[in-house]
């Protein structure tokens, strides 16, 4: 009997690890609470070179409030605030994009299109500001909440989005960006209107977005009726980017089936890492939380 104990244990481990993946609790219940402070609600998130750590930004507007922080899922205290590197603080940071090919370097963008190229030192937990630039023709009436840097071979592109509302569609823009020039410029190539079917009220069609390994664009659509909710979020595959002869184009999905639904949270931050999607919330007065989907579960 003893000689069969080890194979049985291994079999049970494999069964529990893989055979029961679909028996996980609904994703809407699998939140890890970050904070109940309004100041720490999360509006953008990106991975770092340490797989349990994520850089996040906050949409704060007042002096003395944090703009950026680090989530460490392996630590006892999940969140640590970081100092912004300059006295002049950004206003209303809404999204954070990692820069492909550059470890721990990111673009943080505010709702008026002001962008900040920053670098994170994970040894000291310090942020350096490398450069600033602005999205062309940004500012009111646009309210930008999504930004991406895309890299294909030696060509670098940018995509950004106006969130939209009940009365207007979101607008997804894309073009090329001269990221390594002394003065960074973005050349708009095209744009498209995005209108998702749900949520139904206080709608933000695109509150954040990221691209997966198949060039599919994922986006969060939220219901944001006020600082105390109630909130709802749906995650959609909006469409896909194509790259040909150094040109970038976007193909809108024919329909928008919901990929994930969060009945009580406002997901304003998401990042796609291979087979994993990380969601984080800006639940206003209700604080912030983080959630992870692996292989669609």
What are these regions (language model features)?
Residues 1-30:
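Bacterial Sec-dependent N-terminal signal peptides
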Residues 20-297:
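Sequence/structural signature of beta-propeller domains
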């Amino acid at each position: 009997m003893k000689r069969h104990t080890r194979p049985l244990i291994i079999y049970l481990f494999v069964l529990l690890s893989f055979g029961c993946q679909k028996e996980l609790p609904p994703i809407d219940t699998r939140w890890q609470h970050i904070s109940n402070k309004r100041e720490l609600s999360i509006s953008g998130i990106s991975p770092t070179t340490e797989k349990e750590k994520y850089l996040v930004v906050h949409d704060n507007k007042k002096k003395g409030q944090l703009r950026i922080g680090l989530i460490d899922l392996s630590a006892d205290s999940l969140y640590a605030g970081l100092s912004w590197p300059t006295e002049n603080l950004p206003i209303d940071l809404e999204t954070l994009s990692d820069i492909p090919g550059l470890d721990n370097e990111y673009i943080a963008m505010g709702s008026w299109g002001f962008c900040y190229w920053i670098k994170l030192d994970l040894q000291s937990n310090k942020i350096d500001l490398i450069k600033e630039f602005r999205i062309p023709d940004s500012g009111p009436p646009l309210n930008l909440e999504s930004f991406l840097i895309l890299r294909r071979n030696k060509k670098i592109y940018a995509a950004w989005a106006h969130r939209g509302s009940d009365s207007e569609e979101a607008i997804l823009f894309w073009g090329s960006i001269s990221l390594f020039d002394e003065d960074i410029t973005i050349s708009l190539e095209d744009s498209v209107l995005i209108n998702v079917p749900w949520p139904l009220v206080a709608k933000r069609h695109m509150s954040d977005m990221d691209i997966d390994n198949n060039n599919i664009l994922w986006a969060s659509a939220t219901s944001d009726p006020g600082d105390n909710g109630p909130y709802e979020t749906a995650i959609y595959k909006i469409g896909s980017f194509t790259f040909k002869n150094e040109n970038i184009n976007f193909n809108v999905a024919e329909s928008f089936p919901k990929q994930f639904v969060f009945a009580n949270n406002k997901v304003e931050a998401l990042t796609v890492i291979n087979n994993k999607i990380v969601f984080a919330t800006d639940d206003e007065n209700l604080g912030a939380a983080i959630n992870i989907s692996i292989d669609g579960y």
